[in-house]
Amino acid sequence: LLLRVLLELGFHAEPLSARPRWRRPPHEHVARTHMAVRVRIDDRDWLADVGFGSCMLTAPLDLAVAGPQQTTHEPARVVPLEGELRIERLLTGEWLPMYDLLLAPQKAVDLQAANWLISTHPASSFHQNLVVSRTRDEVRHVLVNTRLTTRRAGAEVEYRELDAAGLEQSLVEDFGLPIQDNFRPLFELLSVKQ
């Protein structure tokens, strides 16, 4: 959606693919299942990415700058690799890899295959879990099944395990989502499984 909006507004933008590295062992081989957008403005390439959930970029990154770059939330940096760029976030004093970005533009069919894989493969975390993320002002909320993580700028990270009522309340208050009656059995099931 972001790519389409940027193109419609007249920006020179193209999709790039990336190998997610977030919370994975350093040498684990993973498919390129993430899409980010390269935007060219005044002969400079910028990375725009609003779809990486729990640590999504809250400002574009200048792909030519290898050092730390400030975003609305945590700093990020671009680390040159052989044929790729690694995007990292600074959390609790440590640089953590988000993903390795391939700089070759991607075709729609490749992106469709990646989307199909992460949405339907039985081993995909998105197929097995309830995952919701919202970033606003100076707070991030991430819900994975019944675990709510809240990160506020300059504050300790807060973790909470939610019961069925807490899930419903969090989805409404923290994520701004409407709840339908047929969701409640899922909330009960999730709270029992945890």
Q: Which sequence ranges carry the predicted segments?
A:
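N-terminal accessory/pre-domain segments preceding catalytic cores
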Residues: L7-L9, L81-Q194
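Hydrophobic/aromatic-rich core segments of domains that either
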Residues: R4-R77
